[in-house]
Every structure is written in structure tokens, then in C-alpha cells.
From Swiss-Prot:
This is BTB/POZ domain-containing adapter for CUL3-mediated RhoA degradation protein 2. SUPFAM superfamilies: POZ domain. One of its GO terms (cellular component) is Cul3-RING ubiquitin ligase complex. It comes from Xenopus laevis. It is found in: Cytoplasm; Nucleus; Endosome. One of its GO terms (biological process) is protein ubiquitination.
């Protein structure tokens, strides 16, 4: 055993309650003493316990009476959970405070009992710092893998709006307005996340295969997708065009707000947001099957080609 202080904490064996004897702390002649603090056993030195002007100094300098059992353990009727930290502070005036506010409060209560004002001040400062810590109101996860995306969506109790944008996916040159439209999509995503952050989980995907695409999820399932890119021909040269379908994005965002309720299947809710043009002759069971298994996907496309499709063609299909 070396050093000024040797500290251990062990749990004593269960058995009969030890008898205690009273004597004066000033009679302690050994350098090392044994402490039983609430059932936890510690070895330390009188020098450490009397280094600061505390209740422990009064106990072990003869000013207060202490109790020992028949085996020589000095008894202190307090919780021993944080006594090791208290001894560390008494030894070198430093301490690694617990991360939990609850445990810091426990340690501060023990420090107040032993009249260790320096440790009380450190605990109060730590508690004040945690109160002053600002937690971000709007947190937007950035997807790092498809597996992470799947877990986020499945575990979210809120509807989910995802914006995938990855400008490097383009094989061709962009049209003149594409960069501006891509920026507008990102700006709209930021505005929506600030407006609905408490009701909708907004996530960003910068590793996907699309250039700019919105996805909308409710109760763990994909409800709609708005793809904002298309390939156009200009002077016999392919170009990538990025659109900004603002009205459609607002509409789909408002639709997912209907899915803030717990995850209970609701065919009427699915029917109201899926926009499936079912024939009147379909049975209710067939309608329910189609509503659950279809995802609305809207691709805003503009064509200027040499085929028979007209300029301004917009296709909307489901799969």
C-alpha cells in the first residue's frame, strides 16, 4: 500500500449488526484508518480527512466523537455512494463530477452534510451550467445510409418529410434556371422545418441517387413522392432540368399532418390522402387493399423532344 491515500470501496458481508463503541478521534494513532460509510468500506489517512476545515476534520481531530464497531471500522451513518468522490476532492481539490444532474445533486447533498464548501460550489456551478445549456429546437438529421433512413422513419412517431438533393448525380449540364430552382427547394425545406419542427420530422438525404426529390411518410409508410428533375433536349443536346413545384410540395406537407395520430390503420384517412380514382363498382375490401399498397408519386417533367409529346407535358403516375 503506497501513497498518501489508499481508497477502496467494498460491500461488507451480511451478518449480525455490529456493536459500536465510542471513543475520541484524537486517540487515533495509525496513519491509515478504516471507514464504514453506509455499508461501503473505505481506507484512507487522517491527513486527508483533516486537510480541509470540514466536519470530517472535526471528527478526526478529537473535536467530535466518532463510533467504531468491534472490528475497528469507524461508522458514519451516511450513504457511501459518493464518499469516494469526496475523498478524492479532499486529497487534491479536484473531482470528476457525474454527468447526471440527479447524481450531482446527490453529491452536493453529501458535501453540504460534511461542510465541504468548495465541493458544494463546484456542484452548484455544474448544475447552473446544465441549466444554461441551450438545446436546439429544430434538429434535422442527415442520412448517412439507407439503413439509418429506414430506422429513423420506422421509429418516428411523427410524420416524416425527406428532401433528397445531390447535385453531383447529374450526367449532363443543367438548364439555366436549374441551380436557382434547386436552391429554392432547399430554402423551402428549411422554411417548412422551422414552421412544423414540432409536428413533423424533417430529414435530409445527400447520398441518394436522385438530384432533387421530396418524399412524404406517415405512420411508417411512404405516402407520396415529388421528383423535381427531368431530362430535356436543347439544340440536340441533353440537359438536366430542376423544377420547383412549390404548390405541390405545400400540399403534400399538409397531407402528412393528417398522420400525427397514433399508428392505427384508418382507411378513410388513407383514402382522403391517396387520391386513388377507384371505380364505383369496386368493393370496399378492394379499395382498402389498393389504398394501403399504393404510393402516390408525382414526377414533374417538361419535354421538348422530337416525338409526339407536347411541350409542357406533366405526368403523374403511381406505383
Amino acid at each position: 500500500m503506497s501513497g498518501d491515500t489508499c481508497l477502496t470501496a467494498v460491500c461488507p458481508a451480511s451478518g449480525a449488526k455490529p456493536k459500536t463503541y465510542s471513543f475520541k478521534g484524537g486517540c487515533l494513532g495509525n496513519k491509515y484508518i478504516r471507514l464504514n460509510v453506509g455499508g461501503c468500506l473505505y481506507y484512507t489517512t487522517v491527513q486527508v480527512l483533516t486537510r480541509h476545515d470540514t466536519m470530517l476534520k472535526a471528527m478526526f481531530s478529537g473535536r467530535m466523537e466518532v463510533l467504531t464497531d468491534k472490528e475497528g471500522w469507524i461508522l458514519i451513518d451516511r450513504c457511501g455512494k459518493h464518499f469516494g468522490s469526496i475523498l478524492n476532492y479532499l486529497r487534491d481539490d479536484t473531482i470528476a463530477l457525474p454527468k447526471s444532474r440527479h447524481e450531482i445533486k446527490e453529491l452536493m447533498a453529501e458535501a453540504k452534510y460534511y461542510l465541504i464548501q468548495g465541493l458544494v460550489d463546484k456542484c452548484q456551478t455544474a448544475l447552473q451550467d446544465t441549466n444554461d445549456t441551450y438545446e436546439a429546437v429544430c434538429n434535422i438529421p442527415i442520412i448517412t445510409s439507407p439503413k439509418e433512413e429506414e430506422k429513423l422513419i420506422e421509429s418516428s412517431a411523427k410524420p416524416v418529410v425527406k428532401l433528397l438533393y445531390n447535385r453531383s448525380n447529374n450526367k449532363y449540364s443543367y438548364t439555366s434556371n436549374s441551380d436557382d430552382h434547386l436552391l429554392k427547394n432547399i430554402e423551402l425545406f428549411d422554411k417548412l422545418s422551422l414552421r412544423f419542427n414540432g409536428r413533423v420530422l424533417f430529414i435530409k438525404d445527400v447520398i441518394g441517387d436522385e438530384i432533387c426529390c421530396w418524399s412524404f411518410y406517415g405512420q411508417g409508410r411512404k405516402l407520396a413522392e415529388v421528383c423535381c428533375t427531368s431530362i430535356v433536349y436543347a439544340t440536340e443536346k441533353k440537359q438536366t432540368k430542376v423544377e420547383f413545384p412549390e404548390a405541390r410540395i405545400y400540399e403534400e406537407t399538409l397531407n402528412v399532418l393528417l398522420y400525427e395520430t397514433p399508428r392505427v390503420p384508418d382507411n378513410s384517412l388513407l383514402e382522403a390522402t391517396s387520391r386513388i380514382r377507384s371505380q364505383a363498382s369496386h368493393s370496399e375490401d378492394d379499395d382498402g387493399f389498393e389504398l394501403r399498397d399504393r404510393v402516390r408519386r408525382i414526377h414533374v417533367k417538361r419535354y421538348s423532344t422530337y416525338d409526339d409529346r407536347q411541350l409542357g407535358h406533366q405526368s403523374a403516375y403511381r406505383d
